[in-house]
Regions:
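Zymogen propeptides
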Residues: 2-59, 65, 71-196
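Extracytoplasmic
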Residues: 126-128, 163-164, 198, 234, ...
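General beta-strand structural signal in soluble alpha/beta enzymes
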Residues: 168-172, 213, 307-313
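Short acidic-glycine loop/turn motifs at beta-strand connectors
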Residues: 134-137, 205-211, 242, 267-271, ...
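Short beta-strand segments
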Residues: 132-134, 170-172, 206, 266, ...
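Conserved, well-ordered active-site substructure
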Residues: 179-197, 250-311, 316-352
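Active-site-adjacent helix-turn-beta-strand microarchitecture at beta-sheet edges
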Residues: 105-107, 170-256
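Short, solvent-exposed aromatic-acidic interface loops
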Residues: 146-151, 218-221, 277-283
Length: 352
């Protein structure tokens, strides 16, 4: 700034600051960076594991009882068969599915691999949307991260258009915050984005169809990966764990502890899940004020769930079924959970 008078130097300084703010705003608020996932290893199939020498070595000094017999049925029953990710229900709930092509209307969808039942109920002075999910293949329950563009957000209608194979869509967890950073554990369709298990409660869907919920810091990421993570959703709190309601609501912020619009996921057994949305964003229009955590926990117990997690609340709560949007959210979504046929194409590079 040599040769400039004081006023010119001030103008130049202000201009440089303005340029810096524009650059910051572009990278922090406008430009949508891609997030690069890490493919997670899957557990070995049954029979592929290398035997432990300590368990297979024969003691040369051991005596053998000639009258002893081995019961092959007892030996087989000592270790349960692993669940096939492509046949989670093992033949159960056959009446829920259709063997004569797809059958669907405004309240149900039935095919050979997927069965969905949708209903609305009035509970705790609120409108509750319930999707009862039966899937034979774990790859029918997926997450979309808005085409892997971190910070990007879309309306529920836009996601319905983006995911033509989606049979039902629900707003997902709060994996990203308003500061555009990832919160907690994030695994989407077998791809790992964040390994942090210490910030928030979370739910994990494994490749064998089981789902477990954890409070923050209660599980090690590497051990979860060894079991075969397929999805991980973060936010909370835990609503139901091992068939009981945990005592973790004391001291929760008002926006969590009081009545609010909410969306949550529940688990009954491998292949059987629930997505629940409690309306309330526009209480004057819907006559619905939302739900407290205690009310939502009680609902999942009534549904027969042994595990359940609160996924999100407030203005981003949204759901659609059969292409029909069920409510109007005030904010767009950064991610969504959706149900599809297991061979539906992957949209947005989110894995499958």
């Amino acid at each position: 700034m040599k040769g400039m008078n004081l006023q010119e130097q001030k103008k130049c300084g202000i201009l440089l600051i303005a340029i810096g703010l524009v650059i910051f705003a572009y990278f922090h608020h406008v430009r949508q960076p891609k997030i690069d996932p890490v493919g997670l290893s899957t557990p070995p199939a049954a029979g592929d594991a290398t035997p432990d020498p300590a368990q297979t070595t024969v003691d040369p000094n051991a005596t053998v009882d000639p009258d002893a017999t081995t019961d092959p049925d007892a030996a087989a029953s000592s270790s349960p068969d692993p669940v096939d990710p492509n046949d989670l229900l093992g033949g159960k709930y056959a009446e829920k599915f259709s063997t004569a092509g797809v059958v669907s209307d405004e309240t149900c969808y039935r095919s050979e691999k997927v069965a969905l039942e949708f209903r609305q109920e009035r509970r705790f002075d609120s409108l509750v949307h319930i999707i009862d999910i039966y899937i034979r293949d774990v790859h029918s329950l997926r997450t979309n991260l808005c085409q892997q563009v971190f910070g990007d957000r879309k309306s529920i209608q836009s996601l319905s258009d983006l995911l033509p194979g989606a049979l039902a869509i629900s707003s997902s967890d709060q994996y990203s915050n308003r500061n555009r950073s990832i919160w907690g554990l994030l695994v989407s369709n077998g791809l790992g984005y964040s390994s942090d298990t210490d910030i928030f409660d979370f739910a994990v869907l494994f490749l064998d169809g089981t789902m477990e919920v954890y409070e923050a810091g209660q599980a090690d990421y590497d051990s979860l990966v060894e079991r075969g993570i397929y999805q991980a959703w973060t936010f909370g709190p835990v609503l139901v764990k091992d068939g009981a309601v945990p005592d973790n609501y004391d001291g929760a912020p008002d926006y969590i502890a009081t009545k609010n619009p909410r969306v949550a996921i529940g688990y009954c057994e491998p292949g059987h899940y629930y997505l629940v949305m409690v309306d309330g964003t526009r209480a004057s229009e819907s006559g619905s004020a939302g739900a407290t955590l205690e009310e939502l926990s009680a609902l999942f117990l009534d549904l027969g769930c042994t595990q359940a997690l609160n996924l999100d609340g407030g203005g981003t709560v949204a759901m659609s079924f059969g292409g029909r949007v069920l409510n109007t959210s005030s904010r767009n979504l950064s991610s969504a959970i959706y149900v599809c046929e297991p061979d539906a194409p992957d949209v947005g590079g989110n894995g499958a």
